[in-house]
A protein has these predicted regions:
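Sec-dependent N-terminal signal peptides of Gram-positive bacterial secreted proteins and lipoproteins
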Residues: 1-25
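Extracytoplasmic cell-surface/polysaccharide-interacting catalytic and binding patches
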Residues: 18-255
């Protein structure tokens, strides 16, 4: 009997260790150094910023999953998805927050449409290929076409859209006037409303202006990422990217 108990105990310990290692591996991201972090408050030291981090925040929060060129998406399973009335798909956790955002925006006279949500790895690869072919048709060389595409289209396994937590939002007025996914969208009132209010509903402007060296992507005023209200509030208030926020959390957790 004692021997059986010992075996069960060893098995339990082994399972716990494996689970712990799995979590550690999952959050072993390639992140910017603390010296690279650029906060909107120039007088705020990194140590002070770390002290201010939300008490409940932890880098293994699934809503903080980092996917970029340096951290490809290793998940093989499709995320839990939901469909909106236009047929766009995104993570089920976005349904209520996005509805709340749309409702609040409408009260202020702004209306939006999701133009892109969840994309599978295969869809992302197709989008990249279409972009390259489009630039080739415009007369660019293969190398230049791929270079320009890489500025806006992540490698197939390195797109946030594969998590279902990222959406591309554009104002309906902008779309009705023929507007597309362009940086100039940021000059419109609807884009400014999103940039200044999305955090209230748990979303962050993912690819900020002048943060290209951190995110690896050009400014995209339409691309928003759901991280939850607590994280989004801190990120917005301090002018951070997700990469920078995770770097701060990693430092805090290592102490």
């Amino acid at each position: 009997m004692q021997k059986k108990k010992l075996i069960y105990l060893l098995l339990a310990c082994s399972m716990f260790l494996q689970a712990s290692l799995a979590v550690q591996a999952k959050i072993n991201y390639k992140l910017p150094s603390l010296e690279e972090i650029q906060t909107s408050n120039k007088d705020m030291k990194v140590d002070a910023l770390i002290e201010k981090l939300p008490v409940t925040a932890h880098s293994n929060d699934p809503l903080l999953k980092l996917v970029n060129k340096n951290n490809p998406n290793s998940d093989k399973e499709e995320p839990e998805l939901a469909w909106d009335s236009y047929g766009y798909i995104y993570h089920k956790d976005l349904v209520k927050p996005l509805e709340d955002l749309m409702e609040a925006a409408a009260k202020d006279g702004f209306y939006y449409r999701v133009v892109s949500g969840y994309r599978s790895v295969e869809e992302q690869e197709n989008n990249r290929n279409l972009s390259i072919q489009n630039y080739l048709a415009q007369g660019l060389s293969q190398a230049d076409a791929e270079s320009v595409t890489n500025q806006y289209f992540a490698p197939a396994d390195a797109s946030e859209h594969t998590t279902g937590l990222a959406i591309d939002l554009l104002g309906t007025e902008w779309l009705d006037n023929g507007g597309e996914l362009e940086a100039s969208y940021s000059e419109t009132d609807s884009a400014k409303w999103l940039a200044n209010n999305a955090h209230r509903f748990g979303f962050i402007l993912r690819y900020q202006q002048n943060k290209e060296s951190i995110t690896g992507y050009n400014f995209e005023p339409w691309h928003f990422r759901y991280v939850g209200k607590v994280h989004a509030g801190f990120i917005y208030e301090n002018g951070l990217t997700l990469e920078e926020y995770l770097a701060l959390l990693a430092k805090k957790e290592s102490n």
